[in-house]
């Protein structure tokens, strides 16, 4: 060790443990445009002041550790440390606080969601001083956003590729999700696409199982796509799930999909991981493939109100990592999703600039500086009676995906697809004529039934089906 280093390390160093708030709680700090800002919902252990809890979060997710170390003297902690700069109590909750933390940009590797999450959502979530911790939102500064490619193509490029405008896109998840042979699976895909859907989909856990290996599925689905396109004159697609046990195998499947000439592949981005997802997104942009993203495992992370990571953060991370579609809940179907909160992160997926709006759970203004947008996918327990509400809630830039709501039609898959397409076209036409979908939705569907026996049959089957449970995801 050089004398100079010895002197710097020894001067002013005092071993021991000191409160985090002495270093990491800085209420006077003015945030910078280049800071990554985080809003944490913190539940301290009894006896732990909120200032100490917030400072502990800032410390443990940046430069801090449990004791003073002499190597602190070898760098500038003021430059690199996270700072808890504001704390506010959560209305209606005992001993819960929103703690705002600012992180200097130099803490993070460029273009790496993996590194960003490892820092901000790493060991701190197991910290003993906290009873619970939830990351509610992140502000990603433009300087960091510009280090990411983002979605392979984005909303406008996808519409141009498909030549479909002025309405939501329609999809269907093939059921049963497991157990079909590749040929029967391809048959179901063909029937749905021929009936009027834009897309069909592999379910999230369809990879390459003994009953249906991936290569066989890809071949039969490609045949179904081309046959349906020839008969309808419309561009069609099937989300071929490229998720695999290794990145190399995943890319191999995407390469085969490209060689078949199909328009879109799929990835389970949470179970597959952000590194794999970003790699696939880069491949898709370079090779003209759209990328559909499934969020399998998200509820393990985001459903508890006081611990975990809110889905709006996972949605922002996906936009940075890359994906052209992502499942976002339905508001009206069988899966969790409160309306205002869902629309908050739907806007974060689609729009270029989103203002802070605490009523929708948006803690920070977010500027995406032209990063392409992501289409939200409404999927899970929806059927034709939901079409007016879905069209009104999600608007044109969305994918409405009916699995059981297509394949459960009493006359078969193709009539189920016809029913959904007729219902959608009726709702879009009514909206364009100035009718109120929220108030007149059922009447609009009944009118369309008069000239579509397929829709009438679907309406009869699902007239009593509702999923009325209180949403867990509230402010």
From Swiss-Prot:
Propeptide cleavage-removed residue intervals: 1-2
Record site feature (Transition state stabilizer), residues: 334
Cofactor, free-text remark: Binds 1 Mg(2+) ion per subunit.
Modified residues (N-acetylproline): 3
CDD domains: RuBisCO_large_I (cd08212)
Binding site for substrate: 123, 173, 177, 295, 327, 379
Keyword terms of this UniProt record: Acetylation, Calvin cycle, Carbon dioxide fixation, Chloroplast, Disulfide bond, Lyase, Magnesium, Metal-binding, Methylation, Monooxygenase, Oxidoreductase, Photorespiration, Photosynthesis, Plastid
GO biological process, one term: photorespiration
GO molecular function terms attached to this record: magnesium ion binding; monooxygenase activity; ribulose-bisphosphate carboxylase activity
Reaction catalysis annotation: 2 (2R)-3-phosphoglycerate + 2 H(+) = D-ribulose 1,5-bisphosphate + CO2 + H2O; D-ribulose 1,5-bisphosphate + O2 = 2-phosphoglycolate + (2R)-3-phosphoglycerate + 2 H(+)
Family annotation (Pfam families): RuBisCO_large, RuBisCO_large_N
Localization terms from the record: Plastid, Chloroplast
Active site: 175 (proton acceptor), 294 (proton acceptor)
EC number, as in UniProt: 4.1.1.39
PROSITE patterns: RUBISCO_LARGE
Cofactor: Mg(2+)
PTM annotation (N6,N6,N6-trimethyllysine): residues: 14
GO cellular component, one term: chloroplast
Superkingdom of origin organism: Eukaryota
PANTHER family per record: RIBULOSE BISPHOSPHATE CARBOXYLASE, RIBULOSE BISPHOSPHATE CARBOXYLASE LARGE CHAIN
Quaternary assembly: Heterohexadecamer of 8 large chains and 8 small chains; disulfide-linked. The disulfide link is formed within the large subunit homodimers.
Note: The basic functional RuBisCO is composed of a large chain homodimer in a 'head-to-tail' conformation. In form I RuBisCO this homodimer is arranged in a barrel-like tetramer with the small subunits forming a tetrameric 'cap' on each end of the 'barrel'.
Similarity comment text for this entry: Belongs to the RuBisCO large chain family. Type I subfamily.
Function field: RuBisCO catalyzes two reactions: the carboxylation of D-ribulose 1,5-bisphosphate, the primary event in carbon dioxide fixation, as well as the oxidative fragmentation of the pentose substrate in the photorespiration process. Both reactions occur simultaneously and in competition at the same active site.
HAMAP family: RuBisCO_L_type1 (MF_01338)
Protein name: Ribulose bisphosphate carboxylase large chain
Taxonomic classification: Eukaryota, Viridiplantae, Streptophyta, Embryophyta, Tracheophyta
């Amino acid at each position: 060790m050089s004398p100079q280093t010895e002197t710097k390390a020894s001067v002013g160093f005092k071993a021991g443990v000191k409160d985090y708030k002495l270093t990491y709680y800085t209420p006077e700090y003015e945030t910078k445009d280049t800071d990554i800002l985080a809003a944490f919902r913190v539940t301290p252990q009894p006896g732990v002041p909120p200032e100490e809890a917030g400072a502990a979060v800032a410390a443990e997710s940046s430069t801090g550790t449990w004791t003073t170390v002499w190597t602190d003297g070898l760098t500038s902690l003021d430059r690199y440390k996270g700072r808890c700069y504001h704390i506010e109590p959560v209305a209606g909750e005992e001993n819960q606080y929103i703690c705002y933390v600012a992180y200097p940009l130099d803490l993070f590797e460029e273009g790496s969601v993996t590194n960003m999450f490892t820092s901000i959502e790493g060991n701190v979530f197991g910290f003993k001083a906290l009873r619970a911790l939830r990351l509610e939102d992140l502000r990603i500064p433009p300087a960091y956003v510009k280090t990411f490619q983002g979605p392979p193509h984005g909303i406008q490029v996808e519409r141009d590729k498909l030549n479909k405008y002025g309405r939501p896109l329609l999809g269907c998840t093939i059921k049963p999700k497991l157990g079909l042979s590749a040929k029967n699976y391809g048959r179901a895909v063909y029937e749905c696409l021929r009936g009027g859907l834009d897309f069909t989909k592999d379910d999230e856990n369809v990879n390459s199982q003994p009953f249906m290996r991936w290569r066989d599925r890809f071949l039969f689905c490609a045949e179904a796509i081309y046959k349906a396109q020839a008969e309808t004159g419309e561009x069609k697609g099937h989300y071929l799930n490229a998720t695999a046990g290794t990145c190399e195998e995943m890319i191999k499947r995407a390469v085969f999909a490209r060689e078949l000439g199909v328009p879109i592949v799929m990835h389970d981005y949470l179970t597959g991981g952000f590194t794999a997802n970003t790699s696939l997104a880069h491949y898709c942009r370079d090779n003209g493939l759209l990328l559909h993203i499934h969020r399998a495992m998200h509820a393990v992370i985001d459903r508890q109100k006081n611990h975990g990571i809110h889905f709006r953060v996972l949605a922002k991370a996906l936009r940075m990592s890359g994906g052209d579609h992502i499942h976002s809940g339905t508001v009206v179907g069988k899966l969790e999703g409160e309306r205002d909160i869902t629309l908050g992160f739907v806007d974060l997926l689609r729009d270029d600039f989103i203002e802070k709006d605490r009523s929708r759970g948006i803690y920070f203004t977010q500027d995406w500086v032209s990063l392409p947008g992501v289409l939200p996918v409404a999927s899970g327990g929806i059927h034709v009676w939901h079409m007016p509400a879905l069209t009104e809630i999600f608007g044109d830039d969305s994918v409405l995906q009916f699995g059981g709501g297509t394949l459960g039609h009493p006359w078969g898959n193709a009539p189920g697809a016809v029913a959904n397409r007729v219902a959608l076209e009726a709702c879009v036409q009514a909206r364009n004529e100035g009718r109120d979908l929220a108030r007149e939705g059922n009447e609009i569907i009944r009118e369309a039934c008069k000239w579509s026996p397929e829709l009438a049959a679907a309406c009869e089957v699902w007239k009593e089906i509702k999923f009325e449970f209180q949403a867990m995801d509230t402010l």
